Amino acid sequence: MHWELRVLQQRLERLSAHHPEAWAPPIDVYETEKAFIVTAELPGLNRDQIELAFEDRRLTIRGHRSDRSASGDVLRFHQVERGHGSFVRSFEFADKIEVEHVAADLVDGVLTITLPKVPPAPSRKIEVL
C-alpha cells in the first residue's frame, strides 16, 4: 500500500509540473550499503534559495526560482519551458538516519544530499542463567 501511495504522489507531481505556474525539479533517490543519496537538478538556484529539513525519517526539500520578468525589464517571451516559483518535495526513509552527519552540496546546479544510515547494532551473545 505504501508503494501505491508513492506512485500516486509521483503521478500527481508530474501532472502539476505540466501546469505553467508549477515547477518540480527532477530528483533521484538511491541507496548504497551505508547511505541514501538524493540528487536534485536545480539549475539557476543558489544556496540561499534552497531549504532542507529532516524530521521523523522524512527529508523535505524546499526552494524557489524567481520569475525572470521580476527583474523589472520588459520581456517578450517567444517560448517558455523553464518553470519558476516555489516547490516542495519530501521523501521518507525506512532506515534510521544519522541526522548529525547528513551533508548537502550544490555543484553546477545539482544538489546532492548524503544521508548516512545508522549502522546496525552488533549482535551479542546472551547467556542463559
Feature-to-residue mapping (PLM):
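Short strand-edge motifs at loop-to-beta-strand transitions and within beta-strands
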Residues: 87-89
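Short, well-ordered beta-strand segments enriched in hydrophobic/aromatic residues
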Residues: 36-42, 112-113
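N-terminal leader/pre-domain low-complexity segments
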Residues: 1-39, 60-62, 66-77
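Short proline/glycine- and polar residue-rich coil/turn motifs
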Residues: 81-85
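Residue-level recognition of strand-loop junctions within catalytic nucleotide-signaling folds
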Residues: 55, 64-66, 116
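Beta-rich strand-turn-strand
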Residues: 46-52, 92-122
